[in-house]
Amino acid sequence: MLKNVEIYSKSNCLYCDKAKNYFSQNNIEYVLHDAEIPEVFDALMIRNPYARTMPQIFIDDELIGGYTDLEDWLQTKQD
């Protein structure tokens, strides 16, 4: 089971919604960070200065990346 999931998200973001839906449908709790708040965005830039897209997903403080990165990461965990 996945623990310590964090999602940096913005409104009107299809892939952000997909990530949140994945975790919700699989009963995985996550902390949602609103990247439209300047202080939250600044914190994201400290954690991942190369972030250019949303969402940005962290699991156990490990940067997973965006939604397609999450799909790839989950696939490697199933193999």
Where in this protein do the model-derived segments appear?
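Short alpha-helical
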Residues: 14, 39, 65
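Thioredoxin-like thiol-disulfide oxidoreductase module
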Residues: 34-50
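Alpha-helical elements of the RecA-like P-loop NTPase motor core of helicases
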Residues: 17, 42, 72
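Non-catalytic, surface beta->alpha helical segment in thiol-disulfide oxidoreductase systems
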Residues: 59-79
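Short, glycine/charged-enriched secondary-structure capping and boundary segments
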Residues: 21-23, 47, 71-73
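Conserved beta-strand positions in the Rossmann-like core of class I SAM-dependent methyltransferases
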Residues: 31
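Structural micro-motif
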Residues: 48-57, 67-68
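Local sequence-structure signature of Cys/Sec-based thiol-disulfide redox active-site neighborhoods
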Residues: 1-28
